Amino acid sequence: MADITTEELEELENEVVSKDDNIKTMQEFVSPESLYQELIASVKKYHPSTDISLIEKAYKTADTAHKGQVRKSGEAYIIHPLCVAIILAELELDKETIVAGLLHDVVEDTVMTVEEIASEFSEEIALLVDGVTKLGQLSYDADKVEVQAENLRKMFLAMAKDIRVILIKLADRLHNMRTLKYMTPEKQKEKARETMDIYAPIAQRLGISKIKIELDDLSLKYLEPEAYYDLVEKVALRKSVRDDYVQSLVKEVSKHIENAGIKAQIDGRAKHFFSIYKKMVNQHKTLDQIYDLFAIRIIVDNVKDCYAALGVIHEMYKPIPGRFKDYIAMPKPNMYQSLHTTPVSYTHLRAHETRSNL
């Protein structure tokens, strides 16, 4: 890897967990009260009329229960449940889930009982907290083969009678991964492997791509640090910058597709580090041989429009030879049908892949 200063590495590292990505980077020793206000603002954003009194009660209860406890970072323990609750609010979950997120560690780490939670809050919230506590008791052996990891994932899902229990556990793991740097190197690798093998796949199964992507990238950071930082350095652009670039492409493509009279839904994304790394490993390629660091998806109603959209793209950008795939003429075994092409973009940034799907 080329020479790079510590300051530059830290700046590049922040692109994975960035406020620009609407993912909160919690500064060390941040005020619990400021985080609480952030939580309330987040809840009010998607549920303006919600009664916050129960959330406030849960915050005060958790703060009292965890009084005197500190995390490995040295910050007050209450910071963790607050951050978990904020992640849940970003998923726009109901008030009861937010409350359970604030209380999720009180049974395991304090003298408070499930019965007391049921009495002071509700049976519903008590069951959520109890479910999270029981999931935390599942142990994972990183040396297990994949089939055993899959069995543990199934057990994880089966034990949670309420899907909200899993969502709280995912939020809990995400914040723990964001603050993993305070653990020993051995514990970092252990937690990262468990996250990649168990938690990220579960997030994917539940369709929570935002959490799945961040869990993957954070796991890669600790499991393969050289590869991770090499990607961070070589990709060179903050995710916010890459996302802005993709959105500019989406806007440009949308204009041309509309002018062609094609009805379509168009979106795009910048591929995350783990996705790029996995492709490099599986296909035995270097980063310079990975052409699709960006992807734009065009969804149309019929085959005719699919080919027409492809024609529009090829008029806009020159296609890279050998990168066109016709899954309409030859569908995948699961009957997936689309057209894939990789054109050269009009800026200095790397090429992007465009998919026109039925």
Feature annotation, model-predicted:
Residues 2-350, 356:
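Active-site helical microenvironments for divalent-metal-assisted chemistry
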